[in-house]
Amino acid sequence: MKLFLTQSANVGDVKAYLLHEVFRAAAQKANVSIVGTPAEADLVLVFGSVLPNNPDLVGKKVFIIGEAIAMISPEVTLANALANGADYVAPKSAVSFTGVSGVKNIVAVTACPTGVAHTFMSAEAIEAYAKKQGWNVKVETRGQVGAGNEITVEEVAAADLVFVAADIDVPLDKFKGKPMYRTSTGLALKKTEQEFDKAFKEAKIFDGGNNAGTKEESREKKGVYKHLMTGVSHMLPLVVAGGLLIAISFMFSFNVIENTGVFQDLPNMLINIGSGVAFKLMIAVFAGYVAFSIADRPGLAVGLIAGMLASEAGAGILGGIIAGFLAGYVVKGLNVIIRLPASLTSLKPILILPLLGSMIVGLTMIYLINPPVAEIMKELSNWLTSMGEVNAIVLGAIIGAMMCIDMGGPVNKAAYTFSVGLIASQVYTPMAAAMAAGMVPPIGMTVATWIARNKFTVSQCDAGKASFVLGLCFISEGALPFVAADPIRVIISSVIGGAVAGAISMGLNITLQAPHGGLFVIPFVSEPLKYLGAIAIGALSTGVVYAIIKSKNNAE
């Protein structure tokens, strides 16, 4: 008897390696040969709970067993497999909801790069639409504080559809075996009905890999933007913590806290924690999770190492971007190129890929990437810190306009990532401009509802009150209800106001070390009153422009 060992996609590499070793010993005792390919095998033993969708298994006898039970009693499991192997039946890759009637059970997951705005706004949109249809729905949010409203095993089992609206990689292993549809938070928020229509047509059984989704998802979510946003999402807490610690340390310079006794060395300690550790780690974590998004877990270690090399060399965020993509695609390429016997396959992700990847990418970073990129970042930092007032105003206007063009979309995130990345190079003026501009659209919409109340419906006026609060918290997406109703006019007025706020902030050389927080981090701005003035002027510009160009017919 010839036996081939394999496992479900959700079984970890280390566990798979241990199972293979245990069953190799059990097979030797039972005089069963372990072979390296399904084609050679008389029986295929699958560890896990989901059969792999593998055409090589067609025509083979298979036996599937949970990995925990298999590990406890390998001899008994092997005997059962030899006696009870059944013909392989491939799992269906698509699900038809034709004829499904009555109350549907929907579970959903939402996640965005910052884990703040789109995560929760799309969750509300999904929940509202599902309840309107009379469905049972539960939405799990994967924000910066972790999973909220967590979906239970029982709820997964009862679900008719798993609806995933995520702009970054999120763990979905608990949904294996269920019909799943993937989309972005933006589409789930703005086109909820259309996305659910597509979900019921295009959902596929999720087997723990990357099979669930749509053609659109493959184009949009697997590209550069998704990889970058995965890195940004994991980097942000480090930037926030590091920036605020540095800002707090400055309080001692102004005798806000008495700088004596036990506090004497505290400023230097805080700066060391913020700048010496957090800011160095931010580039490594960013690169690590970019690589993780591309090559999964084998890419993480290589990306972290490459990112730390970029950070130590002074290559900044540009070096981190290159390090992350280089590490990810090198590891992904090695994974495809390197072919090993079945007995050694489990060593590839935990030994061979990290070792070869770290060596190749590390040496490439040290000798080819870091020297020129570090020089570029040095010149860029010098230019940004010594630029004239006119250049500063122009750059501020560009950053401000980009922050307001799509409010949480790719252009917005490009400007935001650029500004956040420069914090690691001790350049803080772009971050101040980006945050000021990002606060403008929602506050500007509130101003417009005050100025031209007769042009807005009662519900829009109420939305204006909510958008004001969101704007103060630096949540640009607070303006999205207005964008959905009147996109061209809202975007034009928002871009004008954002450019004004960004230009004023950069022109006044205002700095900010914290990348998020809105009104709550104003005390850590170099010029708080001037900064509030820049935001107010920008919001007023947006509000006045929109109040003028908005059509009365739009409110009907």
UniProtKB/Swiss-Prot annotation:
Pfam family membership, one: PTS_EIIC
UniProt GO molecular function: carbohydrate:proton symporter activity; kinase activity; protein-N(PI)-phosphohistidine-fructose phosphotransferase system transporter activity; protein-phosphocysteine-D-fructose-phosphotransferase system transporter activity; protein-phosphocysteine-sugar phosphotransferase activity
Protein topology in the membrane: Multi-pass membrane protein
UniProt KW keywords: Cell inner membrane, Cell membrane, Kinase, Membrane, Phosphoprotein, Phosphotransferase system, Repeat, Sugar transport, Transferase, Transmembrane, Transmembrane helix, Transport
Reactions catalysed: D-fructose(out) + N(pros)-phospho-L-histidyl-[protein] = D-fructose 1-phosphate(in) + L-histidyl-[protein]
GO biological process: phosphoenolpyruvate-dependent sugar phosphotransferase system
Compartments reported by the entry: Cell inner membrane
Domain PTS EIIB type-2: 1-85, 106-201
Phosphocysteine: modified positions: C112
Keyword Coiled coil appears in the UniProt entry: no
EC number in record: 2.7.1.202
Residue ranges of the TM segments: 237-257, 275-295, 302-322, 324-344, 349-369, 390-410, 431-451, 468-488, 490-510, 529-549
Cysteine pairs bridged by disulfides in the record: none
Enzyme class: transferase
InterPro entries in the cross-refs: Bacterial_PTS_Sugar_Transport, PTS_EIIB-like_sf, PTS_EIIB_2, PTS_EIIB_2/3, PTS_EIIC, PTS_EIIC_2, PTS_IIB_fruc, PTS_IIC_fruc
Stated induction or repression of this protein's expression: By fructose.
Domain PTS EIIC type-2: 224-556
Gene Ontology cellular-component annotations: plasma membrane
Domain notes: The PTS EIIB type-2 domain is phosphorylated by phospho-EIIA on a cysteinyl residue. Then, it transfers the phosphoryl group to the sugar substrate concomitantly with the sugar uptake processed by the PTS EIIC type-2 domain. In the N-terminal, the PTS system fructose-specific possesses a duplicated EIIB domain (EIIB' domain) which lacks the active site and functions to facilitate phosphoryl transfer between the EIIA domain of diphosphoryl transfer protein (DTP) and the EIIB domain. The presence of the EIIB' domain is required for normal high affinity recognition of DTP by the PTS system fructose-specific as well as for normal rates of phosphoryl transfer between the EIIA and EIIB domains of DTP and PTS system fructose-specific, respectively.
Family annotation (NCBIfam families): FRU, PTS_IIC_fructo
Reported function: The phosphoenolpyruvate-dependent sugar phosphotransferase system (sugar PTS), a major carbohydrate active transport system, catalyzes the phosphorylation of incoming sugar substrates concomitantly with their translocation across the cell membrane. The enzyme II FruAB PTS system is involved in fructose transport.
Protein name: PTS system fructose-specific EIIB'BC component
Source species of the chain: Haemophilus influenzae (strain ATCC 51907 / DSM 11121 / KW20 / Rd)
Phylogenetic lineage: Bacteria, Pseudomonadati, Pseudomonadota, Gammaproteobacteria, Pasteurellales
